[in-house]
Design a protein with these regions (language model features):
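Short secondary-structure boundary/capping segments
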Residues: 38-40, 77-83, 109-111, 157-164, ...
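Extended catalytic-interface subdomain
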Residues: 88-159, 188
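Aromatic/acidic polysaccharide-binding cleft in carbohydrate-active enzymes
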Residues: 137-205
Length: 205
């Protein structure tokens, strides 16, 4: 076999894992990423990667990398430009969004599912625009592959990364949730269910 199939077998997994869904990168618009790309750079690279992967296995599903979050200055132009290149080869575009209440504003916090709703509608509209522009036949669906309430541990995480950067396995991202957080998570789940015709995958992060 190949180097990596032999490596898998040596770790006790004889047969291939038959993974059928692959994301073509992660948050590639982020300046904090090593290897960050412009939308054209990413779109061209992702399209060629997708073509190669589907030559090996035409049954796989591929996810085009969406914006890191809705506050990125290139959102939603990133999605529009990258899909110009990847539309013919991918099945999904990824969405990432986290929610918090650092100002202890319960009313605003409980309404943040409306922000998710607007985010989903914007990405759907962008996907459908590219479909129409390319006179395509297929819908690009959504993979909301990073979402959660996340803010309680931010200060502690920042302190760890700044003052103790070389710890082995530091305690990071360990939020302690409240009933208020649970209500918001419920509202976010309802929002995704409302759009389940296009939000086909979602991963709590």
């Amino acid at each position: 076999g190949t180097k990596y199939s032999d490596w898998r077998i040596s770790h006790g997994v004889k047969d291939p894992l038959n993974i059928k869904t692959w994301c073509l990168g992660n948050e590639m618009d982020g300046p904090w990423q090593l290897g960050a790309k412009t939308p054209v750079e990413y779109g061209r690279l992702a399209a060629e990667t997708a073509k190669a992967m589907k030559l090996i296995d035409p049954t796989i599903e591929l996810v085009s990398c969406g914006s890191s979050n809705t506050q990125m200055p290139t959102f939603p132009q990133w999605e529009a430009t990258t899909l110009e290149h990847t539309y013919d080869y991918v099945d999904y575009v990824s969405l990432h969004q986290y929610f918090g209440n650092p100002d202890n504003d319960t009313e605003n916090f409980l309404a943040q599912s409306m922000e998710m709703d607007h985010f989903i509608k914007t990405v759907i509209a962008t996907c459908d625009f590219v479909k129409a522009k390319k006179r395509g036949k297929k819908d690009i669906n959504l993979s909301f592959d990073e979402w959660n309430v996340w803010f309680h541990a931010n200060a502690a995480d920042d302190d760890t990364m700044k003052n103790h950067p070389w710890q082995q396995a530091p305690a990071l991202l360990e939020d302690h949730y409240t009933f208020e957080d649970a209500l918001v998570v419920g509202l976010l789940l309802i929002t995704m269910i409302k759009h389940s015709d296009r939000v086909r995958m979602a991963c709590l992060a």
